[in-house]
UniProtKB/Swiss-Prot annotation:
GO terms for biological process: regulation of DNA-templated transcription. It comes from Escherichia coli (strain K12). This is Uncharacterized HTH-type transcriptional regulator YtfH. The gene is ytfH. PANTHER family: HTH-TYPE TRANSCRIPTIONAL REGULATOR YODB (PTHR33204:SF37), TRANSCRIPTIONAL REGULATOR, MARR FAMILY (PTHR33204). Residues 20-118 form the HTH hxlR-type domain. GO terms for cellular component: protein-DNA complex. InterPro entries: HTH_HxlR, WH-like_DNA-bd_sf, WH_DNA-bd_sf. It holds the Pfam family HxlR. The keyword Hydrolase does not apply. Keywords: DNA-binding, Transcription, Transcription regulation. GO terms for molecular function: DNA binding; DNA-binding transcription factor activity.
Length: 126
């Protein structure tokens, strides 16, 4: 059995390898706010302030950081209009549409199965 070098693993991608770049992408996509941003943008283009209102509990700082990470990964388009006050819009790229479909399916599954999950949680806490 041959050993696969770290550089080969990084080239091919191996989520279980400590240094694999896919882990950083996974962190951005599956973060608390990343999932909600991707699901919210499935409805279409949103301004920063719209996203902040829509995603309850997110701070301005965390929303900005999460949007920036998703944009850097190629999942979001960001358009800043040169007006006062600032007007910035976010939308999904084709890659973002693909990943948002996956996380939306996970979010749907969670919502559908939440009563059972909560019942098991309560049962095990007792």
């Amino acid at each position: 059995m041959s050993q696969v070098s770290l550089s080969q693993q990084l080239k091919e991608g191996n989520l279980f390898a400590e240094q694999c770049p896919s882990r950083e992408v996974l962190k951005h996509v599956t973060s608390r706010w990343g999932v909600l941003i991707l699901v919210a943008l499935r409805e279409g283009t949103h301004r920063f302030s719209d996203l902040r209102r829509k995603i309850g509990g997110v701070s301005e700082k965390m929303l900005a950081q999460s949007l920036q990470a998703l944009e850097q990964d190629g999942f979001l388009n960001r358009i800043a209009y040169p007006v006062v006050p600032p007007h910035v819009e976010y939308s999904l790229t084709p890659l973002g549409e693909q990943v948002s479909e996956k996380v939306a399916a996970l979010a749907d599954w969670i919502e559908l199965n939440l009563p059972e999950v909560l019942a098991v949680r309560d049962e095990r806490a007792a």
